A protein has these predicted regions:
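Alpha-helical scaffolding within the catalytic cores
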Residues: 26-34, 53-63, 98-103, 178-181, ...
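Bacterial N-terminal signal peptides
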Residues: 7-16
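Boundary/entry segment of secreted carbohydrate-active catalytic domains
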Residues: 19-55
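Substrate-binding cleft of extracellular glycoside hydrolase catalytic domains
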Residues: 58-179, 188-190, 279, 283-286, ...
């Protein structure tokens, strides 16, 4: 009975509040987005730079408390000054353990539902952790898809927490270096780890496909895609293929938006996709910042469609 009660509590923590409800989120100014759309955003998407906050007491805790009620933190390998701070191989070998543990412990102190979204759009050449350059050339073994998968598994285990002995045993089982930090990491049953590629790679090569970076079902809680309407075209087929390729996983749209155009048909189609695919648990609009090319404030037709078709999905 105690075990069943524990499982029931976890379901309340990690799933939308009502049957069929979807968590709606936004990047940028939540208050402005609510004024624009009427949406009471549950999720706030935030972006981090590698190791930012390690030398600033309270900063990492504020990433959670200031991006509630449900923060979605995107972890990047870019340093705050723009250069690459660590490679996927470096993460896989444990050289990022101190930073990752700080985030995990902050999530535990936060104590409520949160998403961790490590190394998103990994099959996009603009990210340091992609295995390929825009011309299709290989970036080398430190950035290989294999090392990415290993890095993601390590991140997952740290974010979920556990005793040092248990985590090290799990790392050993997959041939990885033990933790480079001392002590246990508090467990985080309320944290959902999101694996978020693009539906197809850029460069669009078989070896740079989304699933080339997939770490395995046991290291992913939610599969997600980023989907933008660019020149009145969005990659819906790739989105559906990604959705179908992981039938046991909940799904999210980690970022979606209109790239400098006013296209209400895209908004309506997003609503249709969500309604017709019950595994979708969250969609996050990018972004609410005034004057940004994605700002719904400059897109009256799409804004009206958002109010009519998207906002009710969160009810």
């Amino acid at each position: 009975m105690r075990r069943l009660l524990f499982i029931a509590v976890l379901v309340v923590l990690v799933l939308p509040a009502s049957a069929g409800a979807v968590r709606l989120g936004v990047a940028g100014n939540k208050a402005r987005f609510r004024t624009l759309t009427g949406q009471n955003s549950q999720i706030h998407l935030a972006f981090t730079r590698w190791k930012t906050g390690l030398d600033r007491p309270g900063y990492i805790d504020r990433l959670f408390t200031e991006n509630g009620p449900i923060p979605m933190l995107t972890l990047d390998t870019k340093h705050r000054y723009g250069y690459e701070a660590i490679t996927p191989r470096g993460i896989a070998k444990g050289f990022g353990d101190r930073y990752l543990t700080r985030i995990s412990k902050a999530a535990n102190r936060f104590g409520s539902a949160a998403y961790i979204r490590p190394l998103a759009e990994m099959n996009g050449h603009w990210n340091y952790y992609c295995a390929y350059n825009s011309n299709g050339s290989y970036r080398g073994s430190a950035h290989s898809t294999r090392n990415f998968r290993r890095a993601f598994r390590r991140i997952y285990l740290i974010m979920k927490g556990g005793t040092r002995t248990d985590i090290n045993a799990r790392l050993a089982n997959i041939g990885m270096h033990p933790l480079r930090i001392s002590g246990d990491i508090p467990e985080n049953p309320h944290v959902r780890v999101v694996w978020n590629p693009q539906g197809f790679g850029s460069p669009d090569l078989a070896k740079n496909s989304a699933n080339s970076y997939y770490p395995g079902d046991r290291y992913v809680d939610v599969v997600a895609n980023d989907l933008y309407d660019i020149r009145f075209k969005a990659e819906w087929d790739a989105n559906l293929a990604l959705f179908r390729s992981h039938p046991s996983k909940r799904y999210a749209i980690g970022e979606w938006g209109l790239w400098g155009i006013d296209d209400p048909a895209f908004v309506r189609r997003m609503a249709s996709f969500v309604r017709n695919h019950p595994r979708v648990e969250a969609i996050v609009y990018y972004t609410s910042e005034r004057g940004a090319i994605w700002d719904l404030g400059s897109k009256p037709k799409s804004l009206a469609a958002y109010k009519r078709y998207i906002v009710p999905l969160g009810s």
